Amino acid sequence: MSTLHVISHSPFGDNRLDSCLRLLGANDGLLLCGDAVYALQPGSTACERLTASNLGPRLFALEEDLLARAIADSPARAVDYPAFVALSLDYDKVNSWL
């Protein structure tokens, strides 16, 4: 069973991202939105952890949030809202890390 994990909180304020990365299954995806896209800042510890997690094509970020935070060079695939909806249907479950 696959799960799309959605994180919207900054990786610098709590440990949601680290907890999520520990629990990710082989078929799970991760979507970063809101302040969570700060995890994609090149050179940050959070970005290094994401890169080391080998998510590859299963790492997504809301394009609108990347643009709003001026994050241009990201290992995540940028998606718009319709693609976010499509992603949520591609996975068996969606888990929002509130």
Label every model-predicted segment.
Residues 43-48, 77-80:
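Charged helix-capping and loop-helix junction motifs
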Residues 69-98:
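C-terminal structural segments of small proteins and small subunits
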Residues 28-35, 57-63:
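Short internal beta-strands
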Residues 37-41, 67-70:
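Short, charged/polar "capping" segments at the starts of alpha-helices
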Residues 12-27:
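Histidine-anchored nucleotide/phosphate-binding helix
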Residues 46-70:
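A glycine-rich helix N-cap at a beta->alpha junction
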Residues 7-10, 34, 63-64, 98:
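Structural motif
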Residues 3-16, 36-40:
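Short, glycine-rich nucleotide/cofactor-binding loops
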